[in-house]
Swiss-Prot record:
Signal peptide: none annotated. This is Large ribosomal subunit protein uL1c. SUPFAM superfamilies: Ribosomal protein L1 (SSF56808). The gene is rpl1. The keyword Transmembrane does not apply. One of its GO terms (molecular function) is structural constituent of ribosome. Part of the 50S ribosomal subunit. The keyword Plastid applies. Binds directly to 23S rRNA. Might be involved in E site tRNA release (Potential). GO terms for biological process: translation.
Length: 229
C-alpha cells in the first residue's frame, strides 16, 4: 500500500473526489502549494490515443502567453550567419563542431538545443547523449529551424513542448503556483486549444478522457473538461 507523508495527506484532505471547474481547480492548486520553493504547476492529460500507431501520435509545441516562470537556457548549433543570429538573439550556449564535441564529452548545461537543418547530419552522433534527456533537435518540436533567432526568443519566452507518452498521457507544465489565478487559467486554456488544434488524424472515440492538475509537491485535482470549453 502506497504511503503518503503527513504533509501530503493533509493537503489531499482538502481535495474532494469530484470534478472541479478550471477556476476551482487552479484555486485549490494554489492553496495546496506550500513547499519551501516555487512549485511548478503541472497538467496531466489522458487522451484517447494509442501512440503505437503513427496516426495517433501527438507531439507539438505551444507558447504560453504568461510564460513558464522558469529561466530557460538555450543552446544553438549552427554555422556562419545563423550562428551570429543565435548569439544576437541571446542564446546562452552556441557553436558548431566544437560544441558538438563538448556535448559528446558531457556538456549539458542547457534546457533546449536548437539546430539548423544543415548541421543535423553532424548532430546525429549525439543521439545517445541527447535522446534519453529529450534534448535531440526535432522539426516537430520546433528545434530544427533556419529561423534560429525566432526559436531562441520563443523558447526563452514561454514556448513548451508536449507529447503523449506510451500510455496516451501528456504531462506539461503551465507556470508556477505563485502565478495569479488568471494567468494560470489563461495558460491552461492555451494548452487545451493547442491539443485540440493538433488532434491526430487517427484519433478515435472520445478524445479528452481525464484532466488533472497538481503542483510539484501537491495533490492531484481533477478538472471537469467541459469547464474548459
Amino acid at each position: 500500500m502506497k504511503k503518503f507523508s503527513r504533509r501530503l495527506t493533509t493537503l489531499k484532505s482538502k481535495v474532494e473526489p469530484k470534478l472541479y471547474t478550471i477556476n476551482e481547480a487552479v484555486s485549490i492548486l494554489k492553496a495546496t502549494s506550500n513547499a519551501k520553493f516555487k512549485e511548478t504547476a503541472e497538467a496531466h492529460i489522458a487522451l484517447g490515443l494509442n501512440p503505437k500507431y503513427a496516426d495517433q501520435q501527438l507531439r507539438a509545441t505551444v507558447i504560453l502567453p504568461k510564460g513558464t516562470g522558469k529561466l530557460i537556457k538555450v543552446a544553438v548549433i549552427a554555422k556562419g550567419e545563423k550562428l551570429t543570429e543565435a548569439i544576437s538573439a541571446g542564446a546562452d550556449v552556441s557553436g558548431s563542431e566544437e560544441l558538438i564535441d563538448e556535448i559528446l564529452k558531457g556538456r549539458l548545461d542547457f534546457d533546449k538545443l536548437i539546430a539548423t537543418p544543415d548541421v543535423m547530419p553532424l548532430i546525429a552522433k549525439l543521439g545517445r547523449v541527447l535522446g534519453p534527456r529529450g534534448l535531440m533537435p526535432s522539426p516537430k518540436a520546433g528545434t530544427v529551424t533556419l529561423d534560429v533567432a525566432k526559436a531562441v526568443n520563443e523558447f526563452k519566452g514561454g514556448k513548451v513542448e508536449y507529447r503523449v507518452d506510451r500510455t496516451g498521457i501528456i504531462h506539461v507544465p503551465f507556470g508556477k503556483s505563485s502565478f495569479s489565478q488568471e494567468d494560470l487559467v489563461l495558460n491552461l486554456q492555451t494548452i487545451k486549444e493547442s491539443i485540440d488544434r493538433n488532434k491526430p488524424s487517427g484519433a478515435k472515440g472520445k478524445y479528452w478522457k481525464t484532466f488533472f492538475l497538481s503542483s510539484t509537491m501537491g495533490p492531484s485535482i481533477q478538472i471537469d473538461i467541459t469547464s474548459l470549453l
